Amino acid sequence: MSERAVGNEPGGGPGSVLVLGIDPGTAVTGYGVVARRGVGAVSLVECGVVRTSAGTPLAERLREIYLAVDALLVRHRPFAVSVESVFQGKN
C-alpha cells in the first residue's frame, strides 16, 4: 500500500533538476522527490511511504517496494537518486 502527498509543482516545472530520496525499510519505505531550478529554492514535488504487511513473505514485500520505486522513477525521471544507509535494529 502506498500513501503519498503531492507538492505545489508537479514534475518540478521546466528546467528543474529532480532528486528522489529513499529511506528504505521492509515494513515502511519512505520517499521524497524534490526539485531545484537553477540556484533557487528546493521545492517538494511528492513524498510518501510504501507499506508492506508483516505476514507477507519477504520476496513479495521486496517486489511491492520494487514496483513502487519503479513507478516513481518512471513518473518523475529524477536526475539523481539518494538512498539512506540501511541499518538493522529494534525500535
Descriptions of predicted regions:
Residues 1-91:
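Phosphate- and other anionic-substrate recognition elements at nucleic-acid/protein interfaces
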